Amino acid sequence: MSHYSQAKFNLSAPDISHLSADQGIEVAFAGRSNAGKSSALNRLTRQKSLARTSKTPGRTQLINVFDLDEDRRLIDLPGYGYAKVPMAIKLKWQKSLGEYLQKRESLKGLVVLMDIRHPFKDLDQELIQWAVAADLPVLGLLTKADKLKSGKRKAQLLMAREASLAFCGDVTIHLFSSLNGLGLDNCERVLDKWFGYAQDEELEQE
């Protein structure tokens, strides 16, 4: 059974300061408002409605926390880049997000979800740069990969991996599809490492 299928909703917080105690391990998920973040979380956790999907991009302006166990959490950050969100809210959120990435001790990795057809937009790059500056590893998931044929998919993946070298940090890029599960195993391998699951399993085998 997947570790992630045990995810349970804990709380919704209006900003970083309302999160639970800064202890244990957490991994944050971030992405543009139409990048398919909620669908990816639902696929990862094998739960159809753990993270609420919305036809209206930018609807979720709360931070949602999902517990895997007492010490491990998935953090669902609000989608960014949606034009109808007032500028004052955008700026406040960007400041709060920067502080979270740089100061949160329990944060062990950042998953950035990007539509495979439009990766590395300005805010995606800014987010990755913040994470790299804070010595955080980044997993970039090229979502909606099912929308491209195999050849085009591979070309986009190679292009994105080449582009990621410019960040000069621990940035891994994989394909992902919430629809058919493409790339789920690669995603889980990275998360297992961040959460210490891989280490736990090695100890059990010894």
Swiss-Prot record:
GTP binds at residues 31-38, 58-62, 76-79, 143-146, 176-178. It comes from the Bacteria. The keyword Nucleotide-binding applies. GO terms for biological process: division septum assembly. Keywords: Cell cycle, Cell division, GTP-binding, Magnesium, Metal-binding, Nucleotide-binding, Septation. GO terms for molecular function: GTP binding; metal ion binding. Mg(2+) binds at residues 38, 60. InterPro entries: G_ENGB_dom, GTP-bd, GTP-bd_ribosome_bio_YsxC, P-loop_NTPase. Residues 23-197 form the EngB-type G domain. GO terms for cellular component: cytosol. Pfam families: MMR_HSR1. Its cofactor is Mg(2+). The keyword DNA-binding does not apply. Necessary for normal cell division and for the maintenance of normal septation. NCBIfam families: GTPase_YsxC. Belongs to the TRAFAC class TrmE-Era-EngA-EngB-Septin-like GTPase superfamily. EngB GTPase family. This is Probable GTP-binding protein EngB. It comes from Pseudoalteromonas atlantica (strain T6c / ATCC BAA-1087). The lineage of its organism: Bacteria, Pseudomonadati, Pseudomonadota, Gammaproteobacteria, Alteromonadales.
